[in-house]
Amino acid sequence: MNIFYLHQDPEQAARYQYNKHVVKMILESAQMLCTAHHCIMGSDADVPYKPAHRNHPSTIWARQSGQNYAWLYYHMMELGREYEKRYGKKHLTIVKCEDKLAKLPGGILETGLTEMPQCMPDEYKDECSIQAYWNYYINDKKNIANLKTEKLYEQRPKETY
């Protein structure tokens, strides 16, 4: 369970992800969003997935504010668009969750976008969560990439965070 926060724009953050993460992170994002509904609304939650990893820092972050929830929802949808672009079909999780998760859970706080938790080994952490996730992604997650077909490193933004 994680959110690869590679850019503050949820669309751009989705584009930067390796193929395997585009596939996997759609479901993980939906699970975190569904868990937000369960934790906030209890038995009134009408969402496709049961709660998962309630106490994971990323799952907690998703339900801390409406803005966090919205960021993750838009990121999930952008991952879905990336999936469709790369694989030519719609991800089943998007089919199940797009409408159900579009609405914020009733009672979620409106406290603004909060700092993304850094769910990674300490050696990659940084004052800036985006830089930390790039450190983690490039150094720890490159083994899942097909470097013959994926050109992530060329796409990486040149600015320092």
Regions inferred by a protein language model and the residue ranges of each:
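Sequence termini and other peripheral, non-core segments
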Residues: M1-N55, T59-Y161
